[in-house]
């Protein structure tokens, strides 16, 4: 935050050059902090090389595949959206090292694209562009777990920001298409869409674009994965929502009061809390409050009520906080980043 607050004293070339350099360095390093990249490849190989639907089959169904050994979630079907899964189908025929390289380069480019779009959105909103871009591009979790580990959240992020930028330019139909495309990478990005819809000048066009994208994705999913695949996709997303990670706000809250972990019977409380906060923020947006800022607060509320939380999930929030009309959201985002760093440090040290 010190760098961001002093951005006015930095030259844009040197500051953005540092962002690009850090992205290149983390892109060139091996994906040592997470194994999700092998899961991405495995789901594509299930579909293309083994003729199995990745929403109804798991890595352990093909024990002889060499990628399976490095997959972390060997018993779990793909939790990712159809657009990303179809992208992994393209990678499946490639040699593994080449496919990893494509994902590493792709996520780095997507992250830099998100930085560039944050800059562009800030200028459109009349807000300082360089601090907003640095707030996103210099976040350590984005660099280490996003770019370094090649997480697909960065593909989702650049599509979300494309939708935001298009909405700010009153290109509402295309904004709806981009927002749905982001949700077809990871469903959590769909949270931005209702705020975007309320804030749009031509809501009907945005809704039409979104519905068209949904229809096209539904047809593509039906052709590629079949009815059982679509059912499996929905079931897996629901199942993932019931998981509990070692560190999350709900889990750590109960640990602070002496419990070993979040009691199963109390897990439904947190989705209810999020639903209430979401309803209040949507109402506030309907009454004229800034929709980008409220989408940011809603994303923070989602992250704080998830029972399954990973460090790189903070990238969902970064650009919305950077573009917000209040410093409070940026400070809250930094505090949440510190919480995630502390939680991961505890895991690594124990």
Regions found by a protein language model. Give the residues of each.
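Multi-pass membrane glycosyltransferase architecture that uses lipid-linked
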Residues: 1-235, 241-244, 251, 255-257, ...
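Membrane-interfacial helix-loop-helix junctions in multi-pass membrane proteins
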Residues: 259-262
